[in-house]
Amino acid sequence: DLVGVNIEYTRGLHNTEWNSIYLPFEVPVTEGLLDEFEFAYVNDMHSADTDDNGEIDEIEMEIVKIKTGTLHANHPYFIRAKSEYTILQLSCENTTLHATKETTLNCSSIYMDYAIVGSYKHIKGTEFASMPADRYYAISIDGGWWQIPEDSSLYPFRAYLSMTARDGSPVKVSDEAMRSIRIREKGEGTTGIEEITDNRVE
């Protein structure tokens, strides 16, 4: 760790959908920051058979908004701009730059293992294809978790999601449910998109 350093982080947020953020330093959640952005953490994963055909056809990630406190270093969070084309500028003086590492948040159901992994690397879609989990997802520019195509990539300072069926699992999941995972704010409706409009994930 490097102690007593000045850090500046800048990132453009093109729309008002949720995206992931993963930083190696702590960020105070101030009123000024909340004037322009919303932050959240993952709380749970849910799946449902909405048409009663014996097959899971909807998977959701539940998140909870952060109203105060601190975003901890090396911990995956979610960020949403309150207006389009907003620039996130974080300036932290005399702070600690923590050693970068991948942090994994495990959020499993009875039959499925989910993992949210923070990354500082630029990971190509072809690299995900060779990893051990069943499926990998990143948040698209339109705000939902989508499977990462081989011709796309994950940018640094973000998180990805993996999903693996447990051995002996009787669960059947539809192709549509496996293709995308919605993000739902606790107590509110779902967010997501009907189809991929851009292979680039942010």
Spans of features found by a protein language model:
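A short, polar beta-strand/turn micro-motif
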Residues: 1-35, 64-135, 139-144, 149-196
